[in-house]
């Protein structure tokens, strides 16, 4: 038990911080991430790569909730390394939100991270052989409505001793050639992948080993390296694969599932595959046989992992993914192009070696900083609505719900449910 939580319980709070989910709608292995709830507020006030008021400075210390008084593109030269117990609330940015461009991020050992509504676009100028997002150690993290693209090794990779991680409602796109990988998901500590879009990655969409729940995802236009790669290893794996839709695109030359073996144990249910690239979404359910699932060892009983609240059909998953995933409070030009590719139902899409073909990170409307009289990160007009005081810096005080007031405000800006 965390010391902070133990102290809270000793003074008789009527709710337990540890019992809260990270935000309404958080699911899976990482749903109980605490983030910076027991720390301090940090307001990002500029688009600089470093220094006071920058995003890099914001995530450099533990126990922070990060909000934004500015929108736009933050160009970074070096990788961003995130500290423990940090919450990043990209939905609080004005205008078109935040894109971080030019290099990747490390969340290794960033225990209890909560990351929402932000675009992380690495690009050709980023460090060679590095991921757009990497997690090699650490526990209890959740990534929600993130748009991540253009990794130079993997795009979103989880490995090593990392445990209790959720990636939900996220776009994982266009790992750059020649590697062009969606990502390794290779840890025995538990990873939930719910309602995500993997698109335009030559391989590893994802490559899974260990404990994994892969539910209601859409995989589009994978290349010859493979769609869902089932372990390809003598290490034991135990996965649920439920309600997903695999759609071939112009670059697709292999079937949806590859490289399974007797060590990869999969519970499979109602997964669809549309291989014909004819401009119409008309796939069929994959029969429950090892030959349809890359030779993995199929099991009859679903693994008892923390599940989605509502399990969609594959068709519902496609509708949801094309409408709402990624940093979708305002979709930028990159995500708009990617979604248009999916909705071509096989006729559009490409593997890229340079983000210039997508127009780079594009331009974002920075919006206007809100009036915040007490400087606590919550705009004055919102404070009245949520019951805090616009003249007192009280954003980190706990509401009766157990969330801080700043979390209450941020949660109110975006949908709390997907069904």
UniProtKB/Swiss-Prot annotation:
* Catalytic activity as recorded in UniProt: Eliminative cleavage of (1->4)-alpha-D-galacturonan to give oligosaccharides with 4-deoxy-alpha-D-galact-4-enuronosyl groups at their non-reducing ends
Using the UniProt annotation, give all residue ranges assigned to the region (Disordered).
Answer: 350-395
Give the first-level EC class, as a single word.
lyase
Binding of Ca(2+) occurs at 274, 276, 278, 280, 285
* E.C. no: 4.2.2.2
Name of protein = Probable pectate lyase C
GO MF terms here are: metal ion binding; pectate lyase activity
């Amino acid at each position: 038990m965390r010391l902070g939580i133990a102290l809270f319980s000793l003074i008789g709070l009527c709710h337990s911080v540890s019992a809260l989910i990270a935000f309404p709608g958080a699911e899976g292995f990482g749903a109980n991430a605490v983030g910076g709830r027991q720390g301090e507020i940090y307001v990002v006030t500029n688009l600089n790569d470093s220094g006071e008021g920058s995003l890099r400075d914001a995530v450099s210390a533990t126990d922070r909730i990060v909000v934004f008084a500015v929108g736009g593109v933050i160009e970074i030269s070096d990788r961003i390394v995130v500290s423990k117990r940090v919450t990043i609330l990209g939905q609080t940015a004005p205008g078109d939100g935040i894109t971080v461009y030019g290099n990747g991020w490390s969340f290794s050992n960033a225990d209890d991270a909560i990351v929402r509504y932000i675009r992380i676009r690495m690009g050709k100028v980023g460090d060679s052989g590095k991921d757009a997002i990497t997690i090699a150690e650490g526990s209890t993290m959740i990534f929600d409505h993130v748009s991540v693209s253009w990794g130079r090794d993997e795009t979103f990779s989880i490995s090593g001793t990392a445990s209790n991680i959720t990636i939900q409602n996220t776009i994982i796109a266009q790992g750059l050639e020649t590697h062009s990988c969606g990502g390794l998901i290779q840890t025995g500590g538990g990873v939930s992948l719910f309602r995500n879009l993997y698109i335009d990655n030559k391989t590893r969409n994802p490559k899974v080993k260990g404990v994994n729940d892969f539910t209601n995802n859409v995989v589009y236009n994978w290349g010859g390296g493979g769609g869902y790669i089932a372990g390809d290893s003598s290490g034991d794996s135990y996965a649920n694969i439920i309600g997903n839709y695999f759609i071939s695109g112009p670059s697709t030359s292999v079937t949806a599932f590859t490289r399974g073996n007797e060590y990869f144990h999969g519970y499979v249910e109602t997964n669809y595959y549309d291989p014909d690239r004819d401009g119409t979404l008309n796939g069929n359910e994959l029969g429950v046989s090892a030959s349809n699932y890359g030779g993995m060892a199929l099991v009859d009983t679903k693994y008892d992992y923390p599940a989605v609240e509502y399990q969609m059909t594959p068709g519902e998953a496609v509708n949801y993914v094309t409408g709402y995933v990624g940093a979708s409070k305002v979709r930028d030009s990159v995500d708009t192009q990617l979604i248009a590719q999916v909705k071509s139902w096989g006729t559009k899409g490409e593997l890229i070696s340079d983000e210039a073909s997508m127009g780079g990170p594009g331009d974002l409307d920075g919006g206007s900083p809100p009036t915040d009289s007490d400087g606590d990160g919550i705009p004055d007009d919102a404070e009245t609505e949520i019951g805090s005081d616009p003249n007192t810096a009280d954003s980190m005080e706990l509401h009766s719900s157990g969330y801080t007031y700043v979390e209450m405000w941020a949660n109110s800006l975006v949908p709390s449910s997907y069904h």
